[in-house]
Amino acid sequence: MLLLLGLCLGLSQCVGSQEEAQSWGHSSEQDGLRVPRQVRLLQRLKTKPLMTEFSVKSTIISRYAFTTVSCRMLNRASEDQDVEFQMQIPAAAFITNFTMLIGEKVYQGEITEREKKSGDRVKEKRNKTTEENGEKGTEIFRASAVIPSKDKAAFFLSYEELLQRRLGKYEHSISVRPQQLSGRLSVDVNILESAGIASLEVLPLRNSRQRGSGRGEDDSGPPPSTVINQNETFANIIFKPTVVQQARIAQNGILGDFIIRYDVNREQSIGDIQVLNGYFVHYFAPKDLPPLPKNVVFVLDSSASMVGTKLRQTKDALFTILHDLRPQDHFSIIGFSNRIKVWKDHFDISHSRQHQGWQSVHSPYVAHWRHRHQRGLAEGHQAPQQVRGPQWHWRPERVPHCLPDGWEAHGRGDAHPQDPQQHPRGRPRPSLHLHIGIGNDVDFRLLEKLSLENCGLTRRVHEEEDAGSQLIGFYDEIRTPLLSDIRIDYPPSSVVQATKTLFPNYFNGSEIIIAGKLVDRKLDHLHVEVTASNSKKFVIPKTDVPVGPQKAGKDVTGSPRPGGDGERNPNHIERLWSYLTTKELLSSWLQSDDEPEKERLRQRAQALAVSYRFLTPFTSMKLRGPVPRTDGLKEAHGMSAAMGPEPVVQSVRGAGTQPGPLLKKPYQPRIKISKTSVDGDPHFVVDFPLSKLTVCFNIDGQPGDILRLVSDHMDSGVTVNGELIGAPPNGHKKQRTYFRTITILINKPERSYLEITPSRVILDGGDRLVLPCNQSVVVGSRGLEVSVSANANVTVTIQGSIAFVIPIHLYKKPAPFQRHHLGFYIANSEGLSSNCHGLLGQFLNQDARLTEDPAGPSQNLTHSLLLQVGEGPEAVLTVKGRQVPVVWKQRKIYNGEEQIDCWFARNNAAKLIDGEYKDYLASHPFDTGMTLGRGMSREL
């Protein structure tokens, strides 16, 4: 499947290059004009954007992987240049975020619903791109942009994936293909498994798309520069090759796949159950069980399209598989071209009984197989050129089917094949079908639908690859069935919204995963009952699993990443549950033939994907406008519009192109900055929008004082404190203070805090994350977004309804009375409650009125004189019934970018604020108590 996101920034790409190419072919153009153009073109090719950094950070916790890819580019040319970011990701993964930084503009991805009407068109395009460009088991993400001359760009891609256990190992693959050598290239993988890590290996870099058979694979060790640190439950793997080491691997920058395989410890019991914040996951993978007998039918395309290498490789693989069959196993081979032929098996005399048993199912099985594929072609493929001759004589696309199951078959039942519960004891059960498509023109969507209808698996083999070894590898995954008809039950009073609990087969080396919600978060024990068939006997183990007290979730990703819409939920088990549920809804939608049912499944899958920020066939990604820097804050007031290109986004999983012009267009800022703020030494400004009044005041605090700026701990859960620092000694004659630290505490939905200084941002939501302020980055953690614009400002967005902007004021050569310091602006207060308090928070929902008219006609001379010193006439302001004397002043905000008129309240805002200045002093930066307002008790 091709994963494509086209982001067209700026004017039409390569216009100049196209014109030059046309001019070269013009016979009337003089040779003297051609040479300079050719030289210029060669220079452009030589000075293509330089990739300064390519890094991948992945965190795997309990099989669930969070991965963030960061790529930074530099345009060294004297003109704008096109650049493309390309990344291969696992086909099973969901993209959760994409962010671009072009120059100083930040474009943030947003997952939205996809319009249903474009589904048919998109489906065709998706199939085409998948077949032509898609890697086996991977999707390709592409994003293009235009980098201004001498400027930088950065791309951040985040995706999530649940690792599947195959052949006794979990495999985590990271594509390292930056397309050029990079001075800073790194892959950092953290693995956290509470059950304990039983084995861990890093494979050599793999540049082939094939998975391999797992038999006798290369064991030459990890790539050079790989460092592995491991203990019982945690492992850290770092791959950080130098430019020389990269060049030895591949001079074109296509290093290959960095692959980690590991397994965990298991107890011989009901399985491993983990619980966190009301969600649970159950890993079930028993071992040391006797294998079940299996019946294998190979359905092979014997038409002319298979003649040659593909047929030879397939035959070699089948002979290898036949030698692997156990004495109790049965097999048959069915070939088809324009007719169907059944080859009877030729076991030795000891297998004659099994041979006779198989003969009884040949005819009905062939009929069932033919009917299934005819219906699949009619519904999923609809390609008339693939139907030849009579109605049931058809030619599929080079598709060999390997069809094993875990039961003895003595006929075919009428029950629906994918529901094992519809096959009671003693009744024949359906086969498990392994559908393998060989070639680049396989209709993979058809195979997926057939697999879902028959509880099967689907695999792809490309023509240029070693099909034989891959066929053996696919067979190895299902060669040893241990259980059948597995059903896992939990008490309905304890568990709701569980994922699939019925499974037709369990194979050695695989794993069954179930996730769901707990009704009672304080549950001590969870009753689990497993019903399964093992070699003609039904096994029913029951037990009460202790779940213990549940701890608060942690942000396990621990890496700087774009996001901020909560897509990286600290509760990894909740994310795992949403991932599995979405996958099952998509599979049910693909399998269903009932239109009302398909629409219901589509709506459920779409709603869940939007809620958890998953990019699926039913959702698309759009880019929000750029986040303004401090030096561009005036744009929010309409003084100047930021001219930027409107990106055109194509859904990565098949959504149509979003409408939008390619020409430049003014952007609406994502956040409209209000005047309610505190900055400088420290100067407070509060807005009363209902009265169209702006009031300002100063607080003359002492160095070390911690001021309560916003206090809404009891309602929205947000508290903001600011710590003062004094001017250097022997400086200005007046004592000056500035904010050196802004602390933001969030109590809902999870407790976390931010500590911001002019040099760094510390984010602690369970795991500690330190961001330098001299680098632009966007990170997020369940409803909290932190956007750092290098040496300019920090924007904090909480639950999408609260936003703060903290400007960073740095001085190259500070005067004696200057210090590096911070400001604080309330950009969005919608999510703060009416009970919000603090030096700034108390004014967010209040009104004020001016009770005396300033500067009457007889006061014009006095007014003019006062204007010369920056002050105007006095008046009386009424706030909360209190009379506050104020004087008209002019004050600069936004680091001097804008000058405002305000009414100034003297004496530390006496009578303007509730209580006194000392009532707003916090005992420490993380104090959430308040002596004023509704929260009278002080909480430490």
From Swiss-Prot:
One of its GO terms (molecular function) is serine-type endopeptidase inhibitor activity. Residues 1-16 form the signal peptide. It is found in: Secreted. Residues 35-161 form the VIT domain. Residues 117-136, 208-227, 405-432, 541-571 are annotated as: Disordered. GO terms for biological process: hyaluronan metabolic process. Residues 295-478 form the VWFA domain. One of its GO terms (cellular component) is extracellular region. Pfam families: ITI_HC_C (PF06668), VIT (PF08487), VWA (PF00092). Keywords: Glycoprotein, Protease inhibitor, Secreted, Serine protease inhibitor, Signal. Glycans are attached at N97, N127, N231, N508, N774, N793, N860. The keyword Secreted applies. PROSITE patterns: VIT, VWFA. Residues 407-417 have a biased composition (Basic and acidic residues). Transmembrane segments: none annotated. The keyword Protein biosynthesis does not apply. May act as a tumor suppressor. Belongs to the ITIH family. This is Inter-alpha-trypsin inhibitor heavy chain H5. The lineage of its organism: Eukaryota, Metazoa, Chordata, Craniata, Vertebrata. The gene is ITIH5.
